[in-house]
Amino acid sequence: MEYNKKLYEAIERVAVKNKTLKQELETITSDFKKIKEINIQLKKTTKIAEAFAKYKQKIDAGIVAEELLNTEKDLELVELAQMDLDDAKASIPVIENELKIMLLPTDPNDDKNVIVEMRPAAGGDESSIFVGNLFDTYRAYTESNNWKMKIIEMTPNAVGFSFISFMISGEEVYSRMKFESGVHRVQRVPATESKGRVHTSTITVAVLPEQDEVDVVINPSDLRIDTYRASGAGGQHVNRTESAVRITHIPTGVVAACQEGKSQIENRETAMKMLRAKLWEAAQEQQNAEFANLRKNQVGTGDRSEKIRTYNYPQNRVTDHRISLTLNKLDQIMMGELDEIIDALITDEQTNLMANLGI
């Protein structure tokens, strides 16, 4: 029976891990952070384990069928064995392809909620109007996926919107909405156009994964702790013992010191609290900088030439330029039917990943 033995071994390891995770989860009662981590791992490994069970069943059935064909004389049993073998040979390549996709590395942000920011770019009034149009599309798409939308900010202008931001929460939101990031181009005849000329305008869409709260983990080996005598007014040492504490976080150079406590232990505890707060603040600033840089990279300048997708109203046509996909159903897409486009983009991404990994 022919099958991908290397793939089989890799998937079998994941199935074993899935079983181990389930057993581990049963023993944890109060460590909610650990429970959350295990559940995230189980979410993916369970799908793979279930597919592996189906894969193994088809392989085993094929092996048994081959053995029967080589030994069985009863014509009826031979016919049944041949049917089982044909079914296994047809099913195994399909399941193997599904398993390969499941093994592909995933974006660590795929399970996160998203923050979406929409702005008019080139094209004047039509650009502002289309911000509102595409927002309605996203609202309909949110509802169709049983996600939840929360408006963060809406800034209307004379004809449409100069800015809209909102959050979408739900299952695997970023894994699908991330493909909406970029410049969207619209071609249509404005209501104010008396000569029927088609105008071209653009808007920018940034889709950002919701940021997790930054946890500060301090490695004791990264700390340098100095003690010294506490000073009073005028720099005079107010006691003979070195009760003041200065803690330096060596990797970042962040320093926290305390001398107000009555003992070295008290000052050390206070200095550690201060250090954690300072490191948290520094991490937040870095995270915000990365967040801003991600937004800049996604939306570009808003120039028409940077488009990811074109919406042509006169021809009822939508073209996604990243994969050269054209659909003549703009009216349906603007009502929130984005799945055909997004599914095609996901397939393209998976195909490229498999090609790069040589699988």
From Swiss-Prot:
It holds the Pfam family PCRF. The keyword Cytoplasm applies. It comes from the Bacteria. It is found in: Cytoplasm. Transmembrane segments: none annotated. Its main location: cytoplasm. InterPro entries: PCRF, Pep_chain_release_fac_I, Pep_chain_release_fac_I_sf, Prokaryotic/Mito_RF, RF-1. GO terms for cellular component: cytoplasm. The modification N5-methylglutamine is found at residue 236. SMART domains: PCRF. Keywords: Cytoplasm, Methylation, Protein biosynthesis. GO terms for molecular function: translation release factor activity, codon specific. Methylated by PrmC. Methylation increases the termination efficiency of RF1. Peptide chain release factor 1 directs the termination of translation in response to the peptide chain termination codons UAG and UAA. Belongs to the prokaryotic/mitochondrial release factor family. This is Peptide chain release factor 1. It comes from Ureaplasma urealyticum serovar 10 (strain ATCC 33699 / Western). The lineage of its organism: Bacteria, Bacillati, Mycoplasmatota, Mycoplasmoidales, Mycoplasmoidaceae. The gene is prfA.
